[in-house]
Curated annotation (Swiss-Prot):
It comes from Cryptosporidium parvum. It catalyses: ATP + H2O = ADP + phosphate + H(+). Its EC number is 3.6.4.-. The keyword Transport does not apply. Transmembrane segments: none annotated. Belongs to the actin family. PROSITE patterns: ACTINS_1, ACTINS_2, ACTINS_ACT_LIKE. It comes from the Eukaryota. This is Actin. GO terms for molecular function: ATP binding; hydrolase activity. Keywords: ATP-binding, Cytoplasm, Cytoskeleton, Hydrolase, Nucleotide-binding.
Amino acid sequence: MSEEETQALVVDNGSGMVKAGVAGDDAPRCVFPSIVGRPKMPGVMVGMDQKDCYVGDEAQSKRGILTLKYPIEHGIVTNWEDMEKIWHHTFYNELRVAPEEHPVLLTEAPMNPKVNRERMTQIMFETFNVPAMYVNIQAVLSLYASGRTTGIVLDSGDGVSHTVPIYEGYAIPHAIMRLDLAGRDLTDFLMKILHDRGYSFTTTAEREIVRDIKEKLCYIALDYEEEMKKSQESSELEKTYELPDGHVITVGSERFRCPEALFQPGFLGKEAVGIGETTFQSIMKCDLDIRKDLYANIVLSGGTTMYPGIGERMTKELTSLAPSTMKIKVVAPPERKYSVWIGGSILSSLSTFQQMWITKEEYDESGPSIVHRKCF
């Protein structure tokens, strides 16, 4: 087989977006929402060639007549039937490849239940007949993408955030911390505080508008109290946003109050500590000897780490928590929105990785549990 034919496919399944493409590329070829929509009233649209299910952007655009479901909640697959639909859509409609001709690298959330890894493996080999596959933890791939093998990754996406300490390429399981606070919660919170200002956003369509406002206008304050004072005394922090219908709204302190919830989950009524302190706790659960290496390699990853100001604020928070002599370095790679996918693309193109794949033969011999022996 020629090089082109045996290229691996890399699929990063997030709670909010699926990122998929071909190993060796520097960015995913397709990025679409992890949504499956089914008609609310099947068979009402007579004469329309109505499908029984829609995936991704098409589901998003027809959301008026559909019931939308997210098969991945908080990073973990909860609905396998819909997940299969998403993978089918990824291979056949988005990438337009035959999965039976390519090895497939999938990503998983840290602390993914064992049965889930087995189920992923089973579906790949039995439903899609892939020749080989591998499952890797998302945060580990992000670290590879930054050119490191040791460090701590703060991975925050749409459904969940994790801090994952990694030493010499292996995640340290007992020190992984999970925070059920991510992009979707921040969008909801922004909807709420904009509502307090008199702008009402309620429908799923309007929610998408709020997500866009969040992505375009929000930032993280270095000092929240100072920023609040500044926003009350002058209007220099105010920005305008034009809604699809032409109305213009003004957004002020909401710009930094929304993502501040990452550092103060109390804003959302959550008991948890913020991402700065969670990172600190995660490091403290690791062996004394490697903490220095972790403090000097704090890598941000995922769409919810895209706020301007997040690197400086993380540095400030950790400096106040860590021993005073400790060198702290927070790395915020510009491509961090896709760094999980990029890490997968790098890893699956390495010649040394080729012996790591779980092959069809191995699967037929051992069954789904092979995944625990080969992917750790």
